[in-house]
């Protein structure tokens, strides 16, 4: 078969064969002196050291020719494996005579020692020792036993840790590339191998010449160092550097870390049948569709198209079919249309922070070079239309089925982290629906009565009725809505816009007249219906003007729709909501100009008053009535209050029809702080060190900033930019570690049958409730039955799933704590069971066996990590000595159970705070807690802010001051469960 077998090129003497051998054939270097392998000598723990029972320090001295080691003492009183310096060695030789004992240096000596290790005997001896040993000795024995046992079982010999022959990797893995300009760029490995060869050859020549011992020794040491650098450059001593003092990349570096062989090329390959392009919005797409450019699709689906061409006999064989595709034959486009039907593709938005970052869509062919993305899917992958996305084609039937069943975008309506809709409309869609549902008094057509929707729309289109005017409509024209019997056959007061808005709602939802949950869950309020013979204008005049539907109202409607009708109906409804929003946002034609930014009438007064107050504070400080710290706090508080006063005035005087106000109020874009910087004042800025500067920026953007004010603004702007860049990496690393520990937590079985549970109540922080009991109960299983606290009636039995309605019922009955099944107490081995986990938040149903809940949890914590600010030190204006860590660093602190910065003082006694006395001489406060068993006395720093007052009742482990509790201290005072609960509460903050 092989044509060139055995032929050698007559010009360069190289065998003629496949080019592939340059990746397969290895060479080797025969070393003229044994060399130790740095991994086994320097790795932690040192395998060589453990095998020989020598310290790494001693090994290093021997291997690098700084000391002799006794290999065989023969009849002399020397200890085997003891070290001798050059001088001691000479003295001992003179003392005992030449040949009376054997001592060597270098890797050769280590090799001899390793050959002498009797594995079986050593293992037996260690097992004996383990029976009696304790403490450090025991740990060391266990470690040694591990290594020796491994040698014994694998059949590898210990002396093989020292190399006599050094393998050389194939040339294609350490290539030389010719650059344009005739120069060559070579892999660093070539330099490292070259050093080894040069030193090895020099050593061979010295040995031939019988050179003096000291020179040979030096050359052997250099050879050892050259091999070390080749295997792991920089592990010992200073790394060998190339041009520009750059450390050379050794074999270990080729494998290590994110850029190494494993993570870069083996786990993270680039794949065929993928592409990437800039994304643009596709408002006409359905929720499960995406637009793919023709040129891209033909390349991605090429093999499928070629198969069809041959099947349709347009071409005789695959080669001809390929040529046909490459020529761009007219007939291929129809075939492409057929091929992509029912064949989903995956779209990925980098960085993929959670599982919603990759979703499946059905491709729709479009012209141009852009990928088109459905606007509602943006929120999930945090996509905006200024970047690129990648597209992948699932090839096998199984992959296609998985994409269609598990990953289709229309299925992913709820966020797996909290079960809230992740596909809420944003920006224009919100604005359009907001404008559509506005109400206005006295607009044209007010008080008209229509027989049905079509008549109302006709009146609006022809200019007889305004979108916002309040009109009547016959209830019977919407027979499928869930009206109360008393409401049927009547006339209802609503607006033309709301008629259109309700037209797209699922039929079983009530007619939405007010943007609140009562209307959504219980039906339209009775006050909007006319009694027979009533005058419509009177009813209209008696009604208040409703606020329009905002972003969060739309979110609630979507959640309710999903709860009642599940995925298919919800995704169809979302598309209708999107179209309606875009349409009316366009019709409304909202624009903003500089004149739309309002002017606050009393701004000058507010600012003068603040200046006056600051002057008074400074006077008091100069008289010695307050400390500098107090003055700083007072000044910054004054300016903060001034800014808030302006904000308040802004909200009071704003015109609800102002485009800025509409955008802000609807939740489409911007918030009150943006608005107050445009119209109020910019306020206080942070200096580069994070401390808030006392000089506020008095101007707003409408008036324009002075040069100095502009300069102050740049501090925080720059800090913001750098923080964003730095925190992304930190957050990514945290996610990686979380996934690493949680990935094998999977739902393994239906019920673990544990009798333990977790007693939960609302999570509070001080006096404020951070998470209500109702929210915590939803979707969990009860551990014990829950009884009504007054009547004793059983509200729900043991081991039952608590639905949303049930949770509300339990809380309404006045129950304050419930024992539920929890993953903390689950008894399943290697995972958790369905009952302890509860519902799968992404679907709203009980979780399936096999769901990878650990990874979902890790991603749910990691994904918002990027949004958490890096505001490490955030003090309430007070430059106190207890800086409390916040944001991402705080999350890391919790997961690693570090001792927190700004630690809170906790009480070990359960009881009442009886007094808090201040001691000015030591600058501390003392807190006394009286319990049943005795009095607890706690010393806290003078500047710490107290969380308790005299007379408060405290439990064991409660924090007396603001700050973070150290988990280890809490564990000493309470039990594991309360530590788990505390950590849970902290992460949820």
Curated annotation (Swiss-Prot):
It comes from Streptococcus pyogenes. This is DNA-directed RNA polymerase subunit beta'. InterPro entries: DNA-dir_RpoC_beta_prime, DNA-dir_RpoC_beta_prime_bact, RNA_pol_asu, RNA_pol_N, RNA_pol_Rpb1_1, RNA_pol_Rpb1_3, RNA_pol_Rpb1_3_sf, RNA_pol_Rpb1_4. It catalyses: RNA(n) + a ribonucleoside 5'-triphosphate = RNA(n+1) + diphosphate. Pfam families: RNA_pol_Rpb1_1, RNA_pol_Rpb1_2, RNA_pol_Rpb1_3, RNA_pol_Rpb1_4, RNA_pol_Rpb1_5. It is an enzyme of class 2 (transferase). Its EC number is 2.7.7.6. One of its GO terms (biological process) is DNA-templated transcription. Binds 1 Zn(2+) ion per subunit. One of its GO terms (molecular function) is DNA-directed RNA polymerase activity. Its cofactor is Zn(2+). CDD domains: RNAP_beta'_N. The RNAP catalytic core consists of 2 alpha, 1 beta, 1 beta' and 1 omega subunit. When a sigma factor is associated with the core the holoenzyme is formed, which can initiate transcription. One of its GO terms (cellular component) is DNA-directed RNA polymerase complex. DNA-dependent RNA polymerase catalyzes the transcription of DNA into RNA using the four ribonucleoside triphosphates as substrates. It comes from the Bacteria. Zn(2+) binds at residues 752, 826, 833, 836.
């Amino acid at each position: 078969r092989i044509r060139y077998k055995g032929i050698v090129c007559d010009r360069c003497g190289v065998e003629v064969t496949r080019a592939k051998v340059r990746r397969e054939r290895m060479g080797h270097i025969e070393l003229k002196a044994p060399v130790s392998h740095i991994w086994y000598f320097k790795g932690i723990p040192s395998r060589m050291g453990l095998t020989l029972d020598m310290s790494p320090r001693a090994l290093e001295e021997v291997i690098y020719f700084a000391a002799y080691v006794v290999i065989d003492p023969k009849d002399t009183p020397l200890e085997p494996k003891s070290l001798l310096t050059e001088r001691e060695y000479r003295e001992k030789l003179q003392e005992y005579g030449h040949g009376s004992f054997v001592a060597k240096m270098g890797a050769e000596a280590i090799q001899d020692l390793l050959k002498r290790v009797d594995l079986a005997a050593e293992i037996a001896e260690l097992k004996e020792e383990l029976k009696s040993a304790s403490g450090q000795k025991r740990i060391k024995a266990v470690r040694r036993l591990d290594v020796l046992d491994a040698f014994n079982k694998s059949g590898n010999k210990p002396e093989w840790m020292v190399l006599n022959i050094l393998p050389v990797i194939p040339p294609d893995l350490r290539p030389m590339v010719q650059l344009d300009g005739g120069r060559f760029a070579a892999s660093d490995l070539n330099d490292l191998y070259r050093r080894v060869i040069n030193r090895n050859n020099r050593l061979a020549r010295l040995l031939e010449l019988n050179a003096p011992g000291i020179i040979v020794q030096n050359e052997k040491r250099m050879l050892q160092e050259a091999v070390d650098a080749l295997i792991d450059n920089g592990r010992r001593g200073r790394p060998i550097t190339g041009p520009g003092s750059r450390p050379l990349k050794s074999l270990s570096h080729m494998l290590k870390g994110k850029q190494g062989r494993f993570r870069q090329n083996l786990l993270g390959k680039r794949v065929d049948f993928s592409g990437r392009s800039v994304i643009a919005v596709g408002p006409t797409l359905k929720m499960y569709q995406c637009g793919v450019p023709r040129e891209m699709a033909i390349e991605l689906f090429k093999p499928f198209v070629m198969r069809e061409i041959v099947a349709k006999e347009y071409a005789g064989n695959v080669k001809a079919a390929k040529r046909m595709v490459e020529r761009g034959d007219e007939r291929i486009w129809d075939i492409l249309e057929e091929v992509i039907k029912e064949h989903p593709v995956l779209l990925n938005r980098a960085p993929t922070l959670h599982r919603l970052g990759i979703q499946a869509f059905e491709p729709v062919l479009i012209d141009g070079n852009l990928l088109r993305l459905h606007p509602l899917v943006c929120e999930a992958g945090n996509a905006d239309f200024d970047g690129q996305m990648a597209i992948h084609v699932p090839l096998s039937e199984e992959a296609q089925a998985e994409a269609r069943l598990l990953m289709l975008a229309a299925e992913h309506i709820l966020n797996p982290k909290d079960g809230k809709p992740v596909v809420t409309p944003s920006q224009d869609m919100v604005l359009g629906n907001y404008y559509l549902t506005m109400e206005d008094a006295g607009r044209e057509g007010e008080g008209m009565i229509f027989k049905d929707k079509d008549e109302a729309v006709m009146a609006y289109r022809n200019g007889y009725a305004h979108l916002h005017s309040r009109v009547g409509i016959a209830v019977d024209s919407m027979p499928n809505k869930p009206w109360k019997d008393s409401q049927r056959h009547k006339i209802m007061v609503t607006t033309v816009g709301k008629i259109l808005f309700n037209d797209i709602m699922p039929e079983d939802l009530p007619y939405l007249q007010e943007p609140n949950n009562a209307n959504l869950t219980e039906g339209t309020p009775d006050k909007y219906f006319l009694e027979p013979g009533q005058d419509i204008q009177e009813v209209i005049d008696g009604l208040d003007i409703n606020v329009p539907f905002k972003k969060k109202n739309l979110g609630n409607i979507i959640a309710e729709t999903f709860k009642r009708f599940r995925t298919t109906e919800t995704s169809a409804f979302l598309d209708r909501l999107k179209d309606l929003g875009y349409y009316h946002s366009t019709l409304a034609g909202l624009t903003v100009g500089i004149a739309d930014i309002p002017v606050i009438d009393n701004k000058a007064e507010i600012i003068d008053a603040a200046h006056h107050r600051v002057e008074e504070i400074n006077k008091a400080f100069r008289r010695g009535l307050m400390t500098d710290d107090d003055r700083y706090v007072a000044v910054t508080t004054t300016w903060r209050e001034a800014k808030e006063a302006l904000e308040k005035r802004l909200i009071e005087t704003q015109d609800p029809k102002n485009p800025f106000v509409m955008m802000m109020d609807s939740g489409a874009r911007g918030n009150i702080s943006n608005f107050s910087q445009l119209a109020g004042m910019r306020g206080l800025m942070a200096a580069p060190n994070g401390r808030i500067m006392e000089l506020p920026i008095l101007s707003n953007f409408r008036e324009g900033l002075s040069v100095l004010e502009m300069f102050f603004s740049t501090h925080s702007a720059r800090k913001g930019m750098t923080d964003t860049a730095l925190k992304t990496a930190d957050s990514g690393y945290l996610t990686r570690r979380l996934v690493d520990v949680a990935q094998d937590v999977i739902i393994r079985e239906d019920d673990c049958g544990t009798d333990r549970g977790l007693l939960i109540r609302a999570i509070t922080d001080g006096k404020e409730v951070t998470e209500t009991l109702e929210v915590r109960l939803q979707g969990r299983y009860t551990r014990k039955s829950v009884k009504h606290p007054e009547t004793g009636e059983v509200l729900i039995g043991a081991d039952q799933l608590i639905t949303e309605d049930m949770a509300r019922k339990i809380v309404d009955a006045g129950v304050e704590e419930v024992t539920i099944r929890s993953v903390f107490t689950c008894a399943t081995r290697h995972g958790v069971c369905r009952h302890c986990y509860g519902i799968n938040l992404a679907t709203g149903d009980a979780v399936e066996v096999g769901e990878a809940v650990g990874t979902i949890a890790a991603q749910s914590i990691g994904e918002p990590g990027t949004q958490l600010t890096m505001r490490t030190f955030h003090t309430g204006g007070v430059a106190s000595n207890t800086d409390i860590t916040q944001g991402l660093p705080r999350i890391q602190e919790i997961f690693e159970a570090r001792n927190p910065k700004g630690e809170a003082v906790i009480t070990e006694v359960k009881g009442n705070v009886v007094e808090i006395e201040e001691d000015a001489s030591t600058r501390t406060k003392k807190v006394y807690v009286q319990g049943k068993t005795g009095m607890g006395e706690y010393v806290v720093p003078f500047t710490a802010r107290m969380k308790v007052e005299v007379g408060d009742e405290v439990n064991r482990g409660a924090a007396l001051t603001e700050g973070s509790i150290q988990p280890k201290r809490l564990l000493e005072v309470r039990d594991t469960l309360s530590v788990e609960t505390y950590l849970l509460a902290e992460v949820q903050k």
